[in-house]
Amino acid sequence: MKELVKEKVLKALKELYNTQVENFKVEKPKEEAHGDLASNVAFLLARELKKPPVNIAQELADFLSKDETFKSVEAVKGFINFRFSEDFLKEEFKKFLLSGEAYFKEDLGKGLKVQLEYVSANPTGPLHLGHGRGAVVGDTLARLFKFFNYDVTREYYINDAGRQVYLLGISIYYRYLEKCPERDEETFKEIKEIFEKDGYRGEYVKEIAERLRKLVGESLCKPEEANLKEVREKILKEESIELYYTKKYEPKDVVDLLSNYGLDLMMKEIREDLSLMDISFDVWFSERSLYDSGEVERLINLLKEKGYVYEKDGALWLKTSLFGDDKDRVVKRSDGTYTYFASDIAYHYNKFKRGFEKVINVWGADHHGYIPRVKAALKMLEIPEDWLEILLVQMVKLFREGKEVKMSKRAGTFVTLRELLDEVGKDAVRFIFLTKRSDTPLDFDVEKAKEKSSENPVYYVQYAHARISGIFREFKERYKKDVSVEELINYVQHLEEEAEIKLIKKVLFFKDELVDITLKREPHLLTYYLIDLAGDFHHYYNHHRILGMEENVMFSRLALVKGIKEVVRLGLNLMGVSAPERM
């Protein structure tokens, strides 16, 4: 609808002033009383035309008022307010009914090669609620991009290198050694010291240790006596799942073996959790592969050649402060190991070399301070500034019976994403995670998510779809036939009531909503729109009989609710939420 008004305005500019202006706005006014859409175009022409905006707005309004698309075009304080005519709205609604979701599609992306990287949780523990929220934000954006013809790649970056993976191995070994009847106390003391300072304390670590014990018995209680090769072969032979890391990487010691084994089990669980949410990835990219292929080393050498790397205190530093970071950053420690930042730059450079024209990272809000150094490194590599976009996702607080559930990852006391999915279901999790801007904290009320009432937003929206499906089922039972869209469009002109015109408008504006949501990267606005539409529908349904009315009224109302049903279905589908036929 906005594009249509823009086209009409551009045509008027050509006819009246033989000029064009591209960057004017056509937006929904804050108050309905000001019309369906409003434009600021007159203000942008004032200098060129040497006229006050008020005069230009009036001339344009007078010209555009003759167009039958509009019921009225008014100039108000230099702005132009547009109201669509009912005849135009009804004709558009017919087009929509015949086209279905194709009516809302547009070649917005023009095949632009976009990479969306999201979740990318450390594979050292189960997914928590914050990861789940990031997953839903990323996946919904990916669905919207696909809908608007972007060439989308959904990618998960596996942080399978570095200290956190070593600490997973330490934590598993500590829990394993704890239960050894006879063990090497010196080893246990060393492992315990590291564990108590930095280890992972969740119950899942104990479960992995027990699973390991069932496979290898007590053979790792005394590491100096353990035959690492035999133990590894036993794990590979006895374990019921495919073990990628355990199989691919020859372990240096027991901790290394258990790190790989732990990685395999955690990645399996992460994939399963995401699958339960109907989230899949095109690429699972391993951080370790950047070291295996020599990409990290080559990248640091490239930055050296460009003069951005220097040595200090035995370490290699990157001059990120030259490009907006608050200080320079270490890329290689004095012990010869690379920092996470080094592999991260290599990963982004890898994305660039793969030909992505736009890269969007969905990160946890705790990464906020990390953004300037990444942007600085990309500037050094002469990658355009707008190539990388970073969306931040804030944490989720869980509430039960009005009280916050206290969680601590450090202490290993947290509700996992899997536990929440088991309790309230995928649809409630996905929908509620999108009910607020991603960069603001979200409160998740477990009781409300399970309610079958208007207080539960996902139920409220899904019920609109199910209710309309029920109307058509009842029609078939009563009249012993189905009704086609081709039949229904003949009755659209009989929709006369203010509430009906309002609903038609709401449906037709869905495309503008989707375009805005996609371009602004604000998928939460999809839930706002659907809750609003469902509310208008439920109100209409409660005050208007549909079946059993005289022919023109019944079929026109069936046409109206058919259109609403299609929009609710599409909106839910773009969020990965089901649209049930019955509830």
From Swiss-Prot:
EC number(s) stated in the UniProt entry for this protein: 6.1.1.19
Motif mapping: 'HIGH' region: 121-131
GO cellular component, as recorded: cytoplasm
Record-level Gene Ontology MF annotations: arginine-tRNA ligase activity; ATP binding
GO BP terms, alphabetized: arginyl-tRNA aminoacylation
Class in the EC hierarchy, top level: ligase
Catalytic function, reaction form: tRNA(Arg) + L-arginine + ATP = L-arginyl-tRNA(Arg) + AMP + diphosphate
Record flagged with keyword ATP-binding: yes
Main location: cytoplasm
Entry's localization field: Cytoplasm
Keywords linked to the UniProt accession: Aminoacyl-tRNA synthetase, ATP-binding, Cytoplasm, Ligase, Nucleotide-binding, Protein biosynthesis
The organism's place on the tree of life at top rank: Bacteria
Entries under Gene3D superfamilies matching the protein: Arginyl tRNA synthetase N-terminal domain, HUPs, Isoleucyl-tRNA Synthetase, Domain 1
Alphabetical list of NCBIfam families matching this protein: argS (TIGR00456)
Assembly and oligomerization: Monomer.
The family this protein is said to belong to: Belongs to the class-I aminoacyl-tRNA synthetase family.
HAMAP family assigned to the protein according to its UniProt record, in alphabetical order: Arg_tRNA_synth
Identification of the protein by name: Arginine--tRNA ligase
Organism of this sequence: Aquifex aeolicus (strain VF5)
Lineage: Bacteria, Pseudomonadati, Aquificota, Aquificia, Aquificales
Primary gene name: argS
